[in-house]
UniProtKB/Swiss-Prot annotation:
GO terms assigned for molecular function: ribosome binding
Gene transcribed to yield this protein: rimM
Name listed for the protein in its UniProt record: Ribosome maturation factor RimM
HAMAP family noted in UniProt: Ribosome_mat_RimM (MF_00014)
Organism: Rickettsia rickettsii (strain Sheila Smith)
Subcellular location: Cytoplasm
Pfam families: PRC (PF05239), RimM (PF01782)
Complex formation: Binds ribosomal protein uS19.
Family the UniProt entry places it in: Belongs to the RimM family.
Gene Ontology CC: one annotated term: cytoplasm
Superkingdom field: Bacteria
The record's note on its domains: The PRC barrel domain binds ribosomal protein uS19.
Gene3D superfamilies associated with the record: PRC-barrel domain, RimM
Role according to the record: An accessory protein needed during the final step in the assembly of 30S ribosomal subunit, possibly for assembly of the head region. Essential for efficient processing of 16S rRNA. May be needed both before and after RbfA during the maturation of 16S rRNA. It has affinity for free ribosomal 30S subunits but not for 70S ribosomes.
Length: 165
C-alpha cells in the first residue's frame, strides 16, 4: 500500500462513454496522453490498466479501463481518481512545480506573515490560476506568475498583492 504522499493525482474518470464500458478520462498531464506512459495506480496502490480509444476536442481521453466491459460497470467509476508514483515522475526544471506540491501551501505576504493557503490551481486554457483562501475565509483567483508570486518554496509562497479593503 502506498501513502497518498507518495502518489500524484494524474487523472480522474469523468463519466462513462458509449455502451462498451469505455470511460471519459480527464488527464492532468501535459499533453493529456502522457498519462498513458505512466504506471498508474489507485489510492491503494493497485495497478490500473488503461488503453486509449480516442481523444476528444477538449483533450479528454476515451479509454478502456481495467476489465470493464459494460456501460453499467463503467457508470460506477465516475469520480475515480488515478495516480502515479511520485518517484516515477521526471525531475523538474527550476520554477516548475507539481500541482500536488503547491496545493495547501501557506501563502505569506511580503512581511512573511501567513495570510492564507493555496486552495486550488485551475487552468481554463490561458494559463494557471491560483485560488487562494485567505485567513478570513474569502477566496480570490490570481494569475500564477512571478509578478504575483515572486518567491515559491516547497514550504510556502510569497504573495505580492494588496487586497482591497
Amino acid at each position: 500500500m502506498n501513502s497518498l504522499e507518495n502518489l500524484i493525482l494524474v487523472g480522474v474518470i469523468k463519466s462513462c462513454h458509449g455502451i462498451k464500458g469505455h470511460v471519459m478520462l480527464k488527464s492532468f498531464t501535459d499533453p493529456a496522453t502522457k498519462i498513458l506512459e505512466r504506471n498508474l495506480v489507485n489510492e491503494s496502490g493497485a495497478n490500473i490498466h488503461i488503453k486509449l480509444i480516442s481523444q476528444n476536442a477538449k483533450g479528454e481521453l476515451i479509454c478502456t479501463f481495467n476489465d470493464i466491459a459494460t456501460r453499467n460497470e463503467a457508470e460506477h467509476l465516475k469520480g475515480y481518481k488515478i495516480f502515479c508514483l511520485r518517484a516515477s515522475l521526471p525531475e523538474l526544471e527550476e520554477d516548475e512545480f507539481y500541482i500536488a506540491d503547491l496545493t495547501h501551501l501557506p501563502v505569506l505576504n511580503q512581511d512573511h506573515k501567513e495570510i492564507g493557503k493555496i486552495k486550488n490551481i485551475l487552468n481554463f486554457g490561458a494559463g494557471d490560476i491560483i485560488e487562494i483562501e485567505f485567513s478570513d475565509q474569502t477566496t480570490e483567483l490570481l494569475p500564477f506568475n512571478k509578478e504575483f508570486f515572486p518567491i515559491i518554496t516547497k514550504d510556502y509562497v510569497i504573495l505580492n498583492y494588496q487586497r482591497e479593503a
